[in-house]
Amino acid sequence: MDPYCPFDALDVWEHRRFIVADSRNFITPEFPRDFWMSPVFNLPRETAAEQVVVLQAQRTAAAAALENAAMQAAELPVDIERRLRPIERNVHEIAGALEALETAAAAAEEADAARGDEPAGGGDGGAPPGLAVAEMEVQIVRNDPPLRYDTNLPVDLLHMVYAGRGATGSSGVVFGTWYRTIQDRTITDFPLTTRSADFRDGRMSKTFMTALVLSLQACGRLYVGQRHYSAFECAVLCLYLLYRNTHGAADDSDRAPVTFGDLLGRLPRYLACLAAVIGTEGGRPQYRYRDDKLPKTQFAAGGGRYEHGALASHIVIATLMHHGVLPAAPGDVPRDASTHVNPDGVAHHDDINRAAAAFLSRGHNLFLWEDQTLLRATANTITALGVIQRLLANGNVYADRLNNRLQLGMLIPGAVPSEAIARGASGSDSGAIKSGDNNLEALCANYVLPLYRADPAVELTQLFPGLAALCLDAQAGRPVGSTRRVVDMSSGARQAALVRLTALELINRTRTNPTPVGEVIHAHDALAIQYEQGLGLLAQQARIGLGSNTKRFSAFNVSSDYDMLYFLCLGFIPQYLSAV
């Protein structure tokens, strides 16, 4: 059709024609009127039968999908196990490789330490034979020969004790009623331990005794966190600085110490200085922390710090702060008044950090207030060293040898030379002997120093597991009242923490999957807290020696000063019995 144009074409420049835009000028073809009425746009409605067929088809499809999903879910665990099996094998291989690497690294460190101790000399530079094994030799009592061990002195001696009993085995070896009680409690509370230890006929199991000694050695160790200094090293540095601040740097009878080994050799005089300083304070010293400000079931401090004032009540920490060994605790010096009270920051000068750099030179700072878990362990170590000094004071190791429960002659042929004195001062004569700290000095020089050189990360409870046993037993001997006499019939319930940690060590020997690390740390923390509390009780007692606590030490088979030395270092005193 012809378009309708209300306006005529207009002429513009250059004679071009165009149509003016207007709604009435819309050009379109004619649209069919019945277009939307065609059948394609008007389908008939579904009938009920057709709807039923559609619903049935949908239901059948859903059922088939569910069946396929169920079959796939049934096959899923098998497929997961098939995929995990090679991963587990790889993990076991990696664990074995890591263990081999750790062993190789430890051997390399020991070799480097042995080479580092070799004297720099001329010639071919070769070390004399036996130098590498000299570090593995210790001497506990001055009139006994040195003992050579492989990895762990108490454990190695246990093997020799049971081997020395011959065919009778462990049925003729006893260690005291305290160990018997712990073993019976372990069997009762943890029956699974019978799978890895031989408890037949009421014998003392060698496996159990090994696990128990390892648990005693672990009391003072810190398993949470990574540190470059041990609590034992920090304790020795603190004792030296206290002696230096109270006696002066030049008040030594011999040359000034230049190595950490020199400090270990002078531990007795440093401990005597600590005892004298605490004695001048007046009043009864408190070897306890603020329990209301410490975690109840956790030894480590969250974030490295406890609540303010939790540690300052301990007499050791208070003494170190009073004499300038420890700097001011965080928060003791107000920040707004620091310019008037502490203008040069002297209150925060840390001599321990400088001493660590001078004697250990490890390239790492040592600020005990920033790691209060280590500070707490350091104070416990100092307290334990003081207890050891009191236990060994004026000890007589030359008394009648028949009074000693431990006889090295039963274990080692020729351990006691024939020309040695078989009988010394005993009875009333032994009281006239005032050996002072001679036994402790010999122990530091011939036992502590070699063990420290072999393992600089060693802690005090690893050196003296017998002390840990005494501290754990200290609460059992606590008097109930001044006018009451109570017979203790308990079956070792106070040693639940020690029993649990020992049982975990025994159970892990037979488990494919070891106990979770968190459970082991929880058990260790409970034991460490009990050791700390018992140590405080033991340190506060006026008399802790063998003469005033015969019954307590008899539970550990200790009957003489000679036995006391070996018990502290080994953690047990073996005794042979005739077979039934």
UniProtKB/Swiss-Prot annotation:
Where's it found, cell-wise?
A: Virion; Host nucleus
| UniProt keyword annotation of Oxidoreductase present | no
- Region called Interaction with major capsid protein/MCP, residue ranges: 1-49, 1-50
Write down the Pfam families for this protein, in alphabetical order.
Herpes_UL25
Cite a single GO BP annotation.
Answer: viral penetration into host nucleus
Q: Where is the composition biased (Gly residues)?
A: 119-128
Q: Where is this region: Disordered?
A: 108-129
Q: What InterPro entries does the record point to?
A: Herpes_UL25
* First-listed, main subcellular location of the protein, grouped into a coarse class: virion
Q: Which domain of life is it from?
A: Viruses
Any Gene Ontology CC annotation: viral capsid
Which keywords fit this entry according to its UniProt record? Answer: Capsid protein, Host nucleus, Host-virus interaction, Viral genome packaging, Viral penetration into host nucleus, Viral release from host cell, Virion, Virus entry into host cell
As for family, the record states: Belongs to the herpesviridae CVC2 protein family.
What functional role does this protein have? Answer: Capsid vertex-specific component that plays a role during viral DNA encapsidation, assuring correct genome cleavage and presumably stabilizing capsids that contain full-length viral genomes. Participates in the interaction between the capsid and the tegument through interaction with the large tegument protein/LTP. May mediate the capsid docking to the nuclear pore allowing entry of the viral genome into the host nucleus through binding to host nucleoporins NUP214.
Per UniProt, subunit arrangement is: Heterodimerizes with CVC1. Interacts with major capsid protein/MCP and triplex capsid protein 1/TRX1 at the pentamer vertices. Interacts with the large tegument protein/LTP. Interacts with host NUP214; this interaction might be essential to the capsid docking to the host nuclear pore. Interacts with host TMEM250.
Q: Can you name this protein? A: Capsid vertex component 2
